[in-house]
Regions:
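Soluble "head" domains of membrane/secretory-pathway proteins
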Residues: 2-8, 12, 32, 45-293
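N-terminal signal-anchor transmembrane helix
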Residues: 36-46
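Hydrophobic membrane-insertion alpha-helices, especially the h-region
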Residues: 13-32
């Protein structure tokens, strides 16, 4: 009988250990660290290379929790809440996020199957611009993004690029002629901040406003309407960010598709676990446990 009780006690302890371990693993996976991500493209080189495997912490800016999968399947919008993290995103942080568009460029529709890795070069409340190839933010003297790539861009002209690479968001030659060398200034909305609306700047913020309200913006007789309501100003509900790849000559980023809603963010890339050259399959020993800066 004593032996039976001893075996039963051991089995219960083992089951409790397994349950606790699985629980901790779920908590770790959901709230702290994303699964290892393999990098397929060169858009963030030299900081992150194609073939790198990276670790991403969700503690910056905080884990994202989905509210109701049934709801977003019905109305097309992903409903999320952001838990408090250890700190907010800072300029030059390298972040992983869900791509904010899914097939249709006229509306934001978070693609849960597509992950992007880019560097944050402008925060909510910043005003971002590119002046002769150099990234700038109002009242910020720090270098933003990959400085030596931007210096290379200063020496090049429109003739060196195809129109697809040269022309930028919002892709409207009538009101804006922004390009990869001269862009902005573009105000990056912060939650609670308001802007005035007219036909011209509606082009910059149309997708953001429609994403937040789930209603359509339109223009009638030179006036801006949200559904049937005249709109002179708009107060943003979410924070937004300007994301850019370090390899500025080969990166699909905010220069082309606009600002990133905060609810698309997954977390901050912290280090490379290991790396293989995709062309040769050889292990890159120099990139083993390499901090991402």
């Amino acid at each position: 009988m004593k032996r039976y009780k001893s075996i039963l006690k051991s089995v219960i302890k083992f089951i409790m250990f397994i349950v606790l371990s699985l629980g901790l693993a779920v908590v770790f996976r959901v709230f702290i660290v994303a699964p290892i991500i393999s990098i397929p493209s060169k858009s963030m080189e030299p900081a992150v290379m194609a073939g790198d495997r990276i670790i991403v912490t969700k503690l910056i800016p905080g884990a994202r929790v989905f509210e109701d999968f049934r709801q977003f399947r019905i109305d097309g919008k992903v409903q999320t809440k952001r838990l408090r993290g250890i700190r907010q995103v800072r300029r030059n942080n390298v972040l992983v996020f869900n791509f904010p568009y899914s097939g249709d460029w006229d509306r934001i529709d978070m693609d849960l199957n597509v992950l992007y890795l880019k560097r944050c070069v402008a925060l909510p409340g910043d005003t971002f611009s590119i002046e002769n190839g150099i990234y700038k933010v109002n009242n910020c003297l720090d270098s933003l993004g990959c400085a030596f790539r931007q210096q290379e861009l200063t020496l090049q002209s429109r003739d060196d690029f195809s129109p697809v690479i040269w022309n930028c968001f919002p892709h409207d030659s009538v009101h804006y002629s922004w390009n990869i060398k001269d862009f902005g200034p573009l105000y990056v909305p912060a939650s609670g901040n308001s802007i005035s609306l007219d036909i011209r700047n509606m082009l910059l913020y149309k997708n953001l406003i429609e994403y937040e309200t789930n209603q359509k913006l339109s223009v009638h007789n030179g006036l801006v309407y949200l559904a049937d309501e005249r709109l002179n100003t708009y107060t943003f509900k979410l924070n937004y960010y300007f994301m850019a790849g370090d390899n500025i000559f080969d990166s699909g980023d905010s220069r082309y598709w606009g600002l990133l809603p905060e609810d698309c963010m997954i977390g901050k890339a912290i280090f490379v676990t290991h790396s293989k050259d995709p062309a040769t399959g050889k292990f890159r020993w120099k990139r083993l446990i390499k901090i991402i800066k």
